[in-house]
Amino acid sequence: EKPLAPCEKQVKELFDKAKENHVYLMEAFAYQHSPYITAIKKEIEDGTIGEVRYIDSAFITSDYNKENIRMRRETLGGCTYDLGVYSTSLTLGLLNEEPAKVEASAIFSEEKIDKLTFVVMEFADGKKAAFTCGMTFATDQDRRLDRLEIDGTKGSITGTKFSFNGD
């Protein structure tokens, strides 16, 4: 389950162990293989929207009760580890580069996990990306918000029914 590990050192150890045992190790983000994402990647590669300049996304769900694994600090709970990884992997996958600068701001719960996080990424060539992730809708509501907007020099792609589930 995401994240693969809490720090780079542990991720490297996992990859070393996988290599030593001749097995594959990967994070299983189903959405990356969905027809929706495949079509978006093709539009970008074909230059339909020109050069990508800005990506904005959001993934917000209902809150969870305090017993849920997503709400416990010792199990790497919080919205960034649970939800923000989708926007991060999506942005990096679409832009095919690492950010030069990342800034984030979060609101934390009594359990000291982030419940709402805002992240801004700046890339060396001037591209920018931002995302919001959160577990803020009322616990008794089965709600979620998935949003994606990609702005290019010749147009944009907007998804208001975007799903990080791979639908």
Question: Would you name each region that the model predicts?
Answer:
Residues 1, 25-27, 56, 131, ...:
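Hydrophobic residues in well-ordered beta-strands that form the structural core
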Residues 1-32:
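Beta-strand-loop-alpha-helix segment that lines the small-molecule cofactor/substrate pocket
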Residues 4, 29-31, 58-63, 108, ...:
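Short, flexible active-site-adjacent loop segments at beta-strand->alpha-helix junctions, enriched
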Residues 7, 61-67, 138-141, 158-160:
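A short beta-to-alpha transition loop/helix N-cap that caps and shapes the active-site region
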Residues 16-24, 38-53, 149-152:
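Basic phosphate/pyrophosphate-binding loop/patch that engages nucleotide-derived ligands
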Residues 31-110:
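Predominantly a Rossmann-like dinucleotide-binding segment in NAD(P)-dependent oxidoreductases
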Residues 89-166:
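Contiguous beta-strand/loop segments that form the cofactor/metal-binding neighborhood of enzyme cores
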